[in-house]
């Protein structure tokens, strides 16, 4: 109890002392707090920096191990690809070697067999020799036949020439040109002429008509008719000696038929005739002349509307009024247009000019 009384008596002083002590300690408390905060901030900064350095070391180690793992994995893939490429190249080289050996064996055995080709060439050479001998014999036979035919042809030609020149044979009174007295012996042609017979020409057989009609007589006496070689009577005279042309050929050349020019042969109104012919063919093909004829009762109540050209007060222009031939006074010169083209001189002379030998120029 005494202690309680003592403490109660001292309670007022304790409160004052507590307040005084706290007021004295407040400045030191703030300084100590600032110092503690500074120390804690420095310590925590050191702790954080140390932890960051630790994390950097750990991250570096992790990255090193991870990158080494990726590098080893990539290297393994590269090694596998290189190994696969090397093996494929080796397999290809081996396949090429096998194919080369097999193809060489196949070509040597089946395609280019040396011994078979040697036998084949031997047989071919023997066959060629036999064919060459047969061809040589055939060529010699053909050459002999050709020489024989040429000799026969020359003999016939000489015989015909001798028969043709039989008039040059010498007589008892007059020697011929091949039997000159200045020669020691006569020419071989003299003996050929003596063996040959004179050439005789066969006269063409002309059938003479017993009676001639009036039309034939008019055709013969017309202005444009010419005598023909086939209807001429035979001329009873001696055959002329010499290399002359045949009489029928000369007469055909002399009395050849009329050859009109292009201007005379082609009609002037050919275009008009062609148009009329075309119009006639179209008219023959038509089933109905009035192709677009309307119904019979359709146009009864329809009002007629004249055209502006016909209903004008000036009137229509006449059809031939604008033609050049209707107004000769308006011509610049007195001559009209030439409607027909002139003929070509070169074409008109075709087949009409002959040389002295009778050939066409």
From Swiss-Prot:
SMART domains, sorted: IQ
Annotated localization: Cytoplasm
Domain (IQ): residue spans on this chain: 32-61, 55-84, 91-120
Molecular functions (GO terms): calmodulin binding
Pfam families: IQ
InterPro entries: ASPM, IQ_motif_EF-hand-BS, P-loop_NTPase
Alphabetically ordered keywords of this record: Calmodulin-binding, Cytoplasm, Repeat
GO cellular component, one term: cytoplasm
Magnesium found in the keyword field: no
PANTHER family (alphabetical): ASSEMBLY FACTOR FOR SPINDLE MICROTUBULES
Record's protein name: Spermatogenesis-associated protein 17
Organism name: Homo sapiens
């Amino acid at each position: 109890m005494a202690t309680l009384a003592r403490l109660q008596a001292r309670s007022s002083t304790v409160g004052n002392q507590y307040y005084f002590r706290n007021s004295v300690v407040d400045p030191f408390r703030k300084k100590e707090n600032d110092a503690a905060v500074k120390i804690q901030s420095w310590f925590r900064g050191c702790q954080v920096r140390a932890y960051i350095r630790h994390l950097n070391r750990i991250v570096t180690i992790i990255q090193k191990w991870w990158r080494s793992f990726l590098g080893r994995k990539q290297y393994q893939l590269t090694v596998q690809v290189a190994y696969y490429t090397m093996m494929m190249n080796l397999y290809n080289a081996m396949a090429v070697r096998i194919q080369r050996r097999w193809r060489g064996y196949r070509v040597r055995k089946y395609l280019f067999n040396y011994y078979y080709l040697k036998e084949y060439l031997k047989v071919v050479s023997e066959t060629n020799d036999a064919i060459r001998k047969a061809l040589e014999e055939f060529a010699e036979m053909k050459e002999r036949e050709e020489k024989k035919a040429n000799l026969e042809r020359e003999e016939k030609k000489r015989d015909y020439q001798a028969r043709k020149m039989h008039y040059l044979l010498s007589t008892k009174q007059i020697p011929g040109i091949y039997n000159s007295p200045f020669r020691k012996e006569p020419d071989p042609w003299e003996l050929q002429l003596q063996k040959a017979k004179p050439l005789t020409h066969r006269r063409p057989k002309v059938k003479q008509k017993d009676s001639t009609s009036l039309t034939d007589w008019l055709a013969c006496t017309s202005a444009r008719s010419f005598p023909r070689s086939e209807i001429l009577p035979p001329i009873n005279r001696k055959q002329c000696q010499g290399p002359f042309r045949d009489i029928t050929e000369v007469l055909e050349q002399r009395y050849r038929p009329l050859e009109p020019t292009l201007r005379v042969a082609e009609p002037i109104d050919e275009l008009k005739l062609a148009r009329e012919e075309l119009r006639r063919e179209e008219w023959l093909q038509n089933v109905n002349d009035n192709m677009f004829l309307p119904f019979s009762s359709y146009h009864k109540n329809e009002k007629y509307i004249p055209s502006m050209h016909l209903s004008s007060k000036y009137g229509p222009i006449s059809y031939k009024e604008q033609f050049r031939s209707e107004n000769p006074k308006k011509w610049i010169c007195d001559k009209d247009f030439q409607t027909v083209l002139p003929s070509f001189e070169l074409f008109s002379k075709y087949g009409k000019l002959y040389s002295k030998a009778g050939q066409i120029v």
